[in-house]
């Protein structure tokens, strides 16, 4: 695996999770299956299918800053990036920004209580978590 080349440290999985739980992560970049207006994120149960969170919980809940990255929608979206900006030829069939997520894998309320800084980045816009919910802070040029 390419990521194992020139490693600064190779540690057992158990020790890695202890590092996560101990607050060793300053910033993490994670994918998002869907997010809602409150800032909650779901990666564990999508379209009625149980996927499971894996190590997502330990990483997302214990990092000081969390940056969620994902597309605005899924399945069939056609987007071009040109010198003039973003061109959306076709939106996807499955929205990923929803009123309420199917299951809460990342709790925005817990993040607020913990003092985490949280950003949500899509190809169309950037949002941040505030006390009032999710705030739009940047729109991609188009």
Where are these regions (language model features)?
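Conserved phosphate- and dinucleotide-binding cores of soluble alpha/beta proteins
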Residues: 1-141
């Amino acid at each position: 695996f390419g990521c194992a080349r020139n490693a600064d440290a190779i540690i057992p999985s158990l020790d890695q999770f202890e590092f996560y739980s101990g607050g060793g992560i300053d910033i993490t970049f994670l994918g998002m299956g869907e997010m809602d207006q409150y800032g909650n994120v779901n990666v564990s149960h999508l379209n009625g299918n149980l996927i499971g969170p894996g190590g997502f919980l330990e990483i997302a809940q214990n990092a000081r800053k969390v940056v969620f990255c994902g597309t605005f929608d899924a399945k069939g979206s056609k987007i071009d990036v040109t010198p003039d900006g973003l061109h959306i030829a076709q939106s996807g069939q499955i929205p990923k920004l929803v009123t309420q997520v199917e299951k809460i894998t990342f709790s925005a309320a817990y993040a607020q209580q913990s003092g985490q800084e949280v950003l949500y980045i899509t190809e169309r816009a950037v949002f941040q978590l505030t006390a009032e919910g999710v705030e739009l802070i940047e729109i991609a040029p188009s």
